[in-house]
């Protein structure tokens, strides 16, 4: 599974009969969806980019000077004149120089002098700014079902599907082959102020240097360098890279201030680096809030027979995934396809299966399968795959796991923000409350009641509510009613 290889992983667990779940996807993260009776899926935000954004300004980092000319006049002879002064693309400076008999003037005094030089820009020495258009930014979301095949981090799963969204996109339906269809309706949000963001790109001259940065518009517009708009052949403020020496009679030296790339790179230290891939300019931050429809998903392999328990062997022994789950892979030498008998028991309870399978209904196929991921309660456990067994100690605590999943649920609801609430009708408002409860408490509820069946949870909720109605102490009554209501809501709810 894709999420297994990423550090930033979240789990969203649907309750009995779940048909829709709401996800918050961010760059660099991955969400695993599990729901009873449905295949598990990994969903992640793969990229945020715009193709060929519009250019705003080009800056020159190294001037190319040519055709220097100087004109001088003796005192009282009027101002010196060069026709280049009126030409676009030249830099000129007027001054006064000391004149006399030694330099061909009949009078001693200050005479007029003017120097001009043609200014262009050296090749591969430009810094170009690009601006994003919020309506053209593409958000790429990828979906991958848990098929039971092990896929390395640098490999691509054959069942991986891609959906793209913009601010005007509508619902997208992805076909996952034998696992049915999944629908995605995503609201997009960039993590930066696009109106104040410029991508500054340098002409690439060295492989080891970054070539683009994400900078503020005001900082970009204030750069003290020659600039022009795209398509204009002449540079504005070209004098910023030209220095004129002190005048001497009929001579005035012109100096090129040199390459300013190093100065610009020093100013960009600590600025977020932008990623450019071909004509795609990527954003480094942003998120999408997606409503995922699970109603047309279907489990694969439910009609398979159980595998022969004696013909399994470990290919990868159980290993900590780093996400509070255990991953393993087995090989099978018997008749295929078949369903893998897998369970786990806690110390002192040999008859109770405590494994919560992230890979639902694991199977061995004719061309693969055998990868299993599960979540176990903290403490000593024994994992059984057929007749294979492996002792496993799960670190952590149940209370800590509950707090962690609740914290993630609150973060998820905070990111969804106003879109989580529907005040248009009473039904919509109460539905929003139910969805918010699922978002915040769904993970904690699953951690506590993960191994409890539907009917026991239903009876527990009814019993708590009955105790609340029949308890005379107001505080106890409200506590029982709230607990019972939450258990019933999480058990009977169809949206998360």
Curated annotation (Swiss-Prot):
Transmembrane region(s): 448-468, 480-496
GO CC terms, sorted: host cell endoplasmic reticulum membrane; membrane; viral envelope; virion membrane
GO MF annotations in UniProt: protein dimerization activity
Cytoplasmic-side positions: 469-479
Any Pfam family hit: Flavi_E_stem
Annotated InterPro entries: Flav_gly_cen_dom_subdom1, Flavi_E_Ig-like, Flavi_E_Stem/Anchor_dom, Flavi_E_Stem/Anchor_dom_sf, Flavi_Glycoprot_E_cen/dimer, Flavivir/Alphavir_Ig-like_sf, Glycoprot_cen/dimer_sf, Glycoprot_E_dimer_dom
Region (Fusion peptide): 98-111
Cystine connections: 3-30, 60-116, 60-121, 74-105, 92-116, 92-121, 186-290, 307-338
Keywords: Clathrin-mediated endocytosis of virus by host, Cleavage on pair of basic residues, Disulfide bond, Fusion of virus membrane with host endosomal membrane, Fusion of virus membrane with host membrane, Glycoprotein, Host endoplasmic reticulum, Host membrane, Host-virus interaction, Inhibition of host innate immune response by virus, Membrane, Suppressor of RNA silencing, Transmembrane, Transmembrane helix, Viral attachment to host cell, Viral envelope protein, Viral immunoevasion, Viral penetration into host cytoplasm, Virion, Virus endocytosis by host, Virus entry into host cell, Zinc
Record GO biological process: clathrin-dependent endocytosis of virus by host cell; fusion of virus membrane with host endosome membrane; symbiont-mediated suppression of host innate immune response; virion attachment to host cell
Extracellular membrane side: 1-447
Glycosylation sites noted in the Swiss-Prot or TrEMBL record: 154
CDD domains, A to Z: Flavi_E_C
Protein name: Genome polyprotein
Organism: Louping ill virus (strain Norway) (Li)
């Amino acid at each position: 599974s894709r999420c297994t290889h990423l550090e930033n992983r979240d789990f969203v667990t649907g309750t009995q009969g779940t048909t829709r779940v709401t996800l918050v996807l961010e760059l660099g993260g991955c969400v695993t969806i599990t729901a009873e009776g449905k295949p598990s899926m990994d969903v992640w935000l793969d990229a945020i980019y715009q193709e060929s954004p519009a250019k705003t300004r080009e800056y020159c980092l190294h001037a190319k000077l040519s055709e220097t000319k100087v004109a001088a006049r003796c005192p009282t002879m009027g101002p010196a004149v060069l026709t280049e002064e009126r030409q676009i693309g030249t830099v000129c400076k007027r001054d006064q120089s000391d004149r006399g008999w030694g330099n061909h003037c009949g009078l001693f005094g200050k005479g007029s002098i003017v120097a001009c030089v043609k200014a262009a820009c050296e090749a591969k020495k430009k810094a170009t700014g690009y601006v994003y258009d919020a309506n053209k930014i593409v958000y790429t979301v990828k979906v991958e079902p848990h098929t039971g095949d092990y896929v390395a981090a640098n490999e691509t799963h054959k069942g991986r599907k891609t959906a793209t969204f913009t601010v005007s996109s509508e619902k997208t339906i992805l076909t996952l082959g034998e696992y049915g269809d999944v629908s995605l309706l995503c609201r997009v949000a960039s993590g930066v102020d696009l109106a104040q963001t410029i991508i500054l790109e340098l002409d690439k001259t060295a492989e080891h240097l970054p070539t683009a940065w994400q900078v503020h518009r005001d900082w970009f517009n204030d750069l003290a360098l020659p600039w022009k708009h795209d398509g204009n052949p002449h540079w504005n403020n070209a004098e910023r890279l030209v220095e004129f020496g002190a005048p001497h009679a009929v001579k005035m030296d012109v100096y090129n201030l040199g390459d300013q790339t190093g100065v610009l790179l020093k100013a960009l230290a600590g600025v977020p680096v932008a990623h450019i891939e071909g004509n795609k300019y990527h954003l480094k931050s942003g998120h999408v809030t997606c409503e995922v429809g699970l109603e047309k998903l279907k489990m694969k392999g439910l009609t398979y027979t159980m595998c022969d328990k004696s013909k399994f062997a470990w290919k990868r022994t159980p290993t900590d995934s780093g996400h509070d789950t255990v991953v393993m892979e087995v090989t099978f030498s018997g008749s295929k396809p078949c369903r893998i008998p897998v369970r786990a028991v806690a110390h002192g309870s040999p008859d109770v299966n405590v494994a919560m399978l992230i890979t639902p209904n694991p199977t061995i196929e004719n061309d693969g399968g055998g990868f299993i991921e599960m979540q176990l309660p903290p403490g000593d456990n024994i994992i059984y795959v057929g007749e294979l067994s492996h002792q496993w100690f799960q670190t952590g605590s149940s209370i800590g796991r509950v707090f962690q999943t609740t914290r993630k649920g609150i973060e998820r609801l905070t990111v969804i923000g106003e879109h989580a609430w529907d005040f248009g009708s009473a039904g919509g408002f109460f539905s929003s409350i139910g969805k918010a409860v699922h978002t915040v408490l769904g993970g904690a509820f699953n951690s506590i009641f993960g191994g409890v069946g539907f009917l026991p949870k239903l009876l527990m909720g009814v019993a708590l509510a009955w105790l609340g109605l029949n308890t005379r102490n107001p505080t106890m009554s409200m506590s029982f009613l709230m607990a019972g209501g939450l258990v019933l809501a999480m058990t009977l709810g169809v949206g998360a």
